[in-house]
Amino acid sequence: MSYTVRDHYFHKAKKEHYLARAVYKLQEIQDRYKILKPGNRVLDLGAAPGSWMQFAREIVGPSGLVVGVDLKGVEHRFPEGVVVLQGDVTDPELARSLSVEHGPFDVVLSDMAPSTSGIRVADSARSALLFESALEMARSALRPGGHFVAKLFQGAEFHVLLQAVKRDFEWVKVTKPDASRKQSKEIYVIGMRLRKS
């Protein structure tokens, strides 16, 4: 069930040369919570088509690094300071190699979403699995004090997953950016300041 939303944010993204309207979700989170800072090392999970990498690169600047990972390839040519990898974020070996080669990271972002079936319970369960993978990646790839932002569909698993984030991070917030479609069940969980293990 895939379709393109040709709304205000779609046209704004085209006009401003972003690869997807999803950039405005991250932009709103950044405006509110100041997750990204110049010089940060950022890991973007589920990075295709690349608008979150574009935006993160603008914030971290030339002294920072943005590493994007997605099952699909990303065709856009990014400036220096952006590394794009094709891989499965549920693979524990990927987490180890990312940490060794590019980490530790200051921020882990995840806009991952499952292919939706239209069956709300099944879709939220698949979203929860992706969220858990992102959280596990954050635990292994973030430096202590690092930040985490991840999409999650509201469902039965929400409160359990939120408690897991609260155990790992000092400050946790849940938000639904204005750029999210009104009928969408997506929300974003923000974890700031990863606790030392």
Swiss-Prot record:
The keyword S-adenosyl-L-methionine applies. Its EC number is 2.1.1.166. Gene3D superfamilies: Vaccinia Virus protein VP39. GO terms for molecular function: rRNA (uridine-2'-O-)-methyltransferase activity. It comes from the Bacteria. The keyword Nucleus does not apply. It is an enzyme of class 2 (transferase). One of its GO terms (cellular component) is cytoplasm. Keywords: Cytoplasm, Methyltransferase, rRNA processing, S-adenosyl-L-methionine, Transferase. The active site is at 151 (proton acceptor). It catalyses: uridine(2552) in 23S rRNA + S-adenosyl-L-methionine = 2'-O-methyluridine(2552) in 23S rRNA + S-adenosyl-L-homocysteine + H(+). Its main location: cytoplasm. It is found in: Cytoplasm. S-adenosyl-L-methionine binds at residues 50, 52, 70, 88, 111. Belongs to the class I-like SAM-binding methyltransferase superfamily. RNA methyltransferase RlmE family. HAMAP family: RNA_methyltr_E. Specifically methylates the uridine in position 2552 of 23S rRNA at the 2'-O position of the ribose in the fully assembled 50S ribosomal subunit. This is Ribosomal RNA large subunit methyltransferase E.
